[in-house]
């Protein structure tokens, strides 16, 4: 791989090589922000280690990243789908045939780790490892393969993330020359290092004042990010109002966020069977079909297409009470499986962690409850969700 490495990257490369050839630990934790070029270091390491790309299994929480890896002939998998199998356990007392007083089928999901993975793999790489918890580390260890954890220390972590109890083995901080030429990465660096954001256009990174924000900015973005749920609700309502959406109805072509996981719903790529898309919490996309309904109807059949995929999930049923943030006394029979959607014309950084979009608009807010460190993590996480361009509103 023809890449000029920085001194930080060389140190990381040496640590990786020593660990792989002589190390006594199964895991190595490599930490670095987006502008330090972790991916480049990893690819040079794999080349030096003599590992064929088909011998490396990549795991990620971001299903668009998984698809990007697959399109580039890497073996990428959605981490929950690859590591676990899911069993639906139905409460027998909830089956109407058995219990005439039951109004709906009740069940829970249990997961169990897959006992085997393809024998061709010699190394596992987890791309967004700061979202892992200790239990998942333990499950990964059961395969007996060396594991590289690529951790972004400034990505908002989960409350049960392993990073609170484990220090990284290798830490990169120096921006690479190539990454420094990326305006989005430069903006992320500025936020972390307390550099004041200056109004102006810097190629694919733009900073504008709040008074200059127009609905055009929001509509032209792949995703809008805000810091609070209150602001998110305001933008979602305003966005629907500009599209002349009656607030009591649900329409096709609306942007939504999946608020709960449905382990049985899987799209299998027709060309490459190993490429699968899972209907999981955190996914965003479009309602491509919504059956006609009355204003009071709660459960409505629909179809949902993820942002980054060409096929929709079909034969779904959405809960309109949850979507519209209301409570009604519905007399409908409750379907066995109901999907909870939220409008997704805007998200918070916490909800956006497992995604990325081409063009992102961020409306920065001063939130009293946020300390300085949390505010930095929120801003950094929001900026790094942009793959191509970002507009920051200050």
Give a label for each model feature.
Residues 3-42, 49, 138-139, 143-145, ...:
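Conserved helicase motor core of P-loop NTPases
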Residues 13-15, 53-138:
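Conserved P-loop NTPase motor core of helicases/translocases
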Residues 24-26, 53-55, 95, 120-122, ...:
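Short coil/turn segments at beta-strand junctions that form active-site/ligand-binding loops
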Residues 28-31, 119-126, 200, 336, ...:
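Short, basic, glycine/proline-bearing loop/turn elements
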Residues 36-40, 45, 59-60, 67, ...:
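Core RecA-like ATPase module of SF1/SF2 helicases and allied nucleic-acid translocases
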Residues 53-54, 121, 144-145, 166-171, ...:
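Short glycine-/polar-rich loops that comprise or flank the Walker A/P-loop
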Residues 58-60, 125-127, 146-152, 392-393:
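Structural recognition of the conserved hydrophobic beta-strand(s) that form the central parallel beta-sheet
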Residues 128-132, 153-154, 352, 367:
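Conserved Walker B
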């Amino acid at each position: 791989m023809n890449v000029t490495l920085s001194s930080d990257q060389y140190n990381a490369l040496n640590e990786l090589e020593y660990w792989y050839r002589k190390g006594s630990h199964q895991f190595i934790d490599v930490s670095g922000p987006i502008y330090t070029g972790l991916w480049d270091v990893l690819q040079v390491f794999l080349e030096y280690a003599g590992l064929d790309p088909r011998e490396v299994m990549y795991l990620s929480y971001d299903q668009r990243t998984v698809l990007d890896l697959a399109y580039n002939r890497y073996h990428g998998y959605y981490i929950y789908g690859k590591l676990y199998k899911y069993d639906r356990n139905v409460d027998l007392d909830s089956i109407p045939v058995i219990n005439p007083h039951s109004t709906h089928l009740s069940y829970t999901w249990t997961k169990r780790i897959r006992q085997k993975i393809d024998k061709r793999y010699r190394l596992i790489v987890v791309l967004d490892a700061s979202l892992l918890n200790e239990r998942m580390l333990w499950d990964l260890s059961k395969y007996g393969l060396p594991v590289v954890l690529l951790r972004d220390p400034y990505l908002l972590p989960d409350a049960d993330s392993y990073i609170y109890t484990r220090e990284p083995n290798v830490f990169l901080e120096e921006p690479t020359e190539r990454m420094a030429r990326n305006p989005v990465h430069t903006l992320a660096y500025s936020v972390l290092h307390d550099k004041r954001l200056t109004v102006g256009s810097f190629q694919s990174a733009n900073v504008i004042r709040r008074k200059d924000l127009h609905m055009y900015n929001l509509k032209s973005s792949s995703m809008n990010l805000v810091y609070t749920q209150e602001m998110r609700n305001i933008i979602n309502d305003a966005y629907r109002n500009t599209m002349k959406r009656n607030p009591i109805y649900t329409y096709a072509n609306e942007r939504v966020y999946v608020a709960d996981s449905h382990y049985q719903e899987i799209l299998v790529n027709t060309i490459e069977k190993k490429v699968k898309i899972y209907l999981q919490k955190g996914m965003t996309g479009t309602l491509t079909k919504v059956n006609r309904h009355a204003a009071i109807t709660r459960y409505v059949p629909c179809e949902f297409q993820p942002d980054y995929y060409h096929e929709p999930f079909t034969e779904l049923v959405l809960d309109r009470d949850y979507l519209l943030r209301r409570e009604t006394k519905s007399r409908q029979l409750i379907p066995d499986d109901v999907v909870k959607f939220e409008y997704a014309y805007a998200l918070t950084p916490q909800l956006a962690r497992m995604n990325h979009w081409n063009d992102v608009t961020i409306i920065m807010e001063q939130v009293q409850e946020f300390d300085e460190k949390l505010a930095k993590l929120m801003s950094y996480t929001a900026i790094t969700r942009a793959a191509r361009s970002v507009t920051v509103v200050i």
